[in-house]
Amino acid sequence: MIKVKWCGFDFGQCLMEPTSLRNPLLFGDIFKQLGQPERIKTTIRKYRILKEKYGDYSVMKEGHREEIMSFVLDGDQEAMDLFSIKEKEMLQPGEGLREALVYLTEQKTDINVVSELKKTLGPMTSNIIIGFLNRNELTHFFNELITPQGKINVADGSVDSSYKGLTKQSGTIYDKLREELAQRDILPSEAVIIGDKPATDILPAKERGFKTIQYVGYIDFGEVGADYKISNFLELINLVKGAVM
């Protein structure tokens, strides 16, 4: 059991379960619905090229979503609008997430999102993560959204630009976060990062003293040295306990 005052969740393949969107046939469905079946083959080929370039849908979604729109969908407004609708319909929270968030809230833990979201297709406060939390009625559990674009206060929408340009993979987001938590008398060992990717969620956070929990409910990258490994968020109830602030 680890005692923590602060908790940061990754978004893609962690809070957000993108299984349905891994299937390139989704793009075929879009052009069938638009009455343009002749575009399906080329669109699916472009999607596969982009997936090969970045490795997985969640990476594309968080950092390169504009390329899905411009390259895969050719900037076609109708196709982009339909993709956004289907995307919202298909994205679901990870298994056991709501129950875990209720528990962490009861434990007086400060709950946040720490994402590698590098670009948005609109105002920062209307990004894909905020939209996901709103649609699934999860927003009230979270205090801040920390990204390379800035830190958003979920309650009032204000943006702290001091995080702009920092990233999880380089570790600079964790450096900044460690400094801020120190001002609140929270040690890195009293904060936990929960995510799936070794290079962004586990290794750089652990190197800076944060507790780490590897989520393998969507994809398991193997043993990467995390303090704990979970496949269902309900497991957090037996792993994490709130520490008195």
Where in this protein do the model-derived segments appear?
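N-terminal helical cap/lid subdomain that shapes the substrate entry/recognition surface
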Residues: 2-99, 106, 122
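Asp-based, Mg2+/Mn2+-dependent phosphohydrolase catalytic module
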Residues: 1-9, 17, 32-37, 75-77, ...
